[in-house]
């Protein structure tokens, strides 16, 4: 209430930024955009002030039959289909890798389903995020034009919202060996189709500081200080083929203290990979009954879930999904999926392990998942574990030194 009495407060205009412009960076001239190719896009000039959190990948291409004619109406690109075409995404600072995302389609889907809100859907369509089967990303000729914000693909771009100064930044994309997971064909005996990437460019904001801010920034970096960058990176692990049992123990990895998990997201897909008749952007519940995450001897959640999905008993699973946004983003939750759509499209198990006791605050941390289902896991079931953990990077703007803290 004191604010309404502050009539003496002066009017202040924020003129700290003199100019803000978007620049497009292309891959090296010799780069091709075929399956298994590696695409490198580099910001060569280091005497810049850039804002990677607002950068985006601009991707153009065509989705046609093998003879370049239009595909049938029953053949569509799936949600984040272009993500399925990128096997690996890497972000480098001064030649040092600071962030990596493998199996970009699955990683961005698992993170997106728990992070996005319904009011973002219209904007997300421009990035290739479509959840309705009747929404097409291509025109009649099969052309598509997408602008994918980097914060959908990288924890670095999502969390680090400040500018970078005197840094050579580079992204490396490895294109998948097949594009079959990027589309779904609903008709029997469907035609041969192909996805052709025609152009990839990186749209990056350049920020020009006002004279006052520029002098302050230059005075600060003159002593070559170690500037800390803290963000949460997304690490995907895959169990390609679950055994035909109703209970399974998965020793995922052993992590360092700094990079121990803060959140773990578990998802299953049954016979969806490399099958054009199945939507590779959806997940299956596999009649999941219980899930436990163990960090050394500490378990999350504390009690059993005791789900019975066949009897419509999965309220706890949906609650774990809706609670993610309030703890991860410190805001009121606005879940993307309704309870029914959650079960149909993305029944993910979201485990919050961000609050940890003294028992796991020293030494290495063993990460183990134990899960069971009401029935045996179906044949050709793949389990995905997305681990979200902290990462700290330090860089010196004058000496161009970059190091990851572990």
Feature locations, PLM:
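Short, low-complexity Pro/Thr/Gly
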Residues: 1-406
């Amino acid at each position: 209430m004191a604010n309404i009495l502050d009539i003496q407060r002066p009017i202040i205009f924020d003129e700290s930024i003199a100019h803000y412009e978007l620049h497009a960076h292309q891959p090296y001239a010799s780069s091709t955009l075929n399956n298994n190719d590696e695409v490198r896009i580099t910001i060569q000039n280091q005497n810049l002030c850039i804002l990677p959190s607002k950068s985006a990948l601009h991707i153009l291409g065509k989705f046609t039959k093998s003879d370049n004619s239009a595909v049938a109406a029953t053949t569509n690109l799936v949600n984040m289909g272009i993500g399925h075409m990128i096997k690996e995404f890497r972000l480098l600072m001064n030649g040092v890798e600071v962030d990596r995302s493998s199996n970009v389609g699955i990683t961005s889907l698992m993170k997106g389903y728990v992070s996005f809100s319904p009011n973002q859907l219209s904007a997300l369509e421009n990035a290739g995020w479509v959840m309705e089967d009747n929404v097409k990303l291509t025109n009649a000729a099969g052309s598509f034009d997408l602008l994918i914000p980097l914060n959908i693909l990288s924890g670095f771009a999502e969390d680090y919202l400040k500018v970078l100064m005197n840094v050579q930044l580079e992204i490396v994309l490895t294109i998948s060996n097949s594009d079959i997971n990027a589309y779904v064909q609903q008709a029997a005996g469907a035609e041969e189709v192909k996805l052709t990437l025609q152009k990839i460019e990186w749209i990056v904001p350049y920020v020009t500081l006002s004279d006052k801010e520029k002098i302050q920034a230059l005075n600060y970096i003159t002593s070559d200080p170690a500037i800390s960058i803290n963000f949460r990176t997304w690490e995907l692990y895959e169990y390609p083929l679950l055994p035909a049992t109703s209970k399974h123990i998965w020793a995922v990895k052993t992590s360092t203290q700094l990079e121990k998990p803060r959140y773990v997201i578990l998802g299953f897909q049954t016979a969806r990979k490399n099958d054009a008749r199945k939507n590779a952007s959806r997940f299956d519940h596999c009649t999941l009954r219980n899930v436990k995450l163990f960090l050394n001897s500490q378990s999350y959640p504390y009690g059993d879930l005791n789900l019975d999905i066949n009897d419509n008993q999965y309220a706890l699973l949906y609650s774990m999904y809706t609670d993610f946004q309030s703890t991860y983003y410190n805001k009121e939750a606005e879940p993307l999926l309704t309870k029914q759509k959650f079960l149909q499209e993305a029944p993910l198990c979201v485990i919050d392990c961000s609050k940890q006791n003294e028992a796991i605050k020293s030494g290495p941390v063993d990460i183990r998942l134990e899960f069971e289902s009401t029935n045996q896991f179906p044949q050709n079931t793949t389990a995905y574990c997305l681990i979200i953990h902290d990462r700290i990077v330090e860089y010196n703007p004058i000496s161009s030194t970059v190091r990851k803290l572990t």
